[in-house]
Amino acid sequence: MRSKVKTIVSSGLAAGILDITAAILIYAVILHKTTAEKILQSIASGVFKKDAYTAGAEMTFIGLGFHFLIAFIFAWFYFKIFPYIPFFKINTVLSGVSYGFFIWVVMNLIVLPIVFPVLPEKKLDFALLLSILIVICCVGIPIAFITRKYYAKWY
């Protein structure tokens, strides 16, 4: 029998690992747009600003920590709202897709503009669709499936 904490931790870990792995593979390895280190430093720069890029390897690990903190927060939130959203109990894949899109909206239209007041304008292009797809597939869907497994014993 799974516990609430194990469910939230496992869904947060799965989402965090899948998301950062996809980001590094796609943006650093395949597209050569950046490096794994810069991806993680950019996460840390939300708090440490420009110092995140010059403070060395420790900022890479701090960025990774922030990344997982965010993943755990979204995993916890889905776990808490699951019993109150009837749709989540009906179709796990569509629930994950909708929650992944919700996460993308929260991060890109609320959190990032607050943390980084000057961001490039968003255009409906391949990069935008790719970023949405990564969050849906690597964060929303895994959180939905892991959380659903916990609640399956009640619904």
Q: What residues fall within each predicted segment?
A:
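Hydrophobic alpha-helical transmembrane segments
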Residues: 61-79
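Membrane-interface helix-boundary motifs at transmembrane edges
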Residues: 2-3, 83-90, 153-155
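Alpha-helical transmembrane segments of multipass membrane proteins
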Residues: 14-23, 70, 74, 99, ...
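Terminal transmembrane helical module of multi-pass membrane proteins
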Residues: 126-155
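Interfacial helix-loop-helix junctions of multi-pass membrane proteins
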Residues: 53, 109-130
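N-terminal signal-anchor transmembrane alpha helix
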Residues: 2-31
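Membrane-interface interhelical connector segments
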Residues: 30-56
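Internal alpha-helical transmembrane segments of multi-pass membrane proteins
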Residues: 84-105
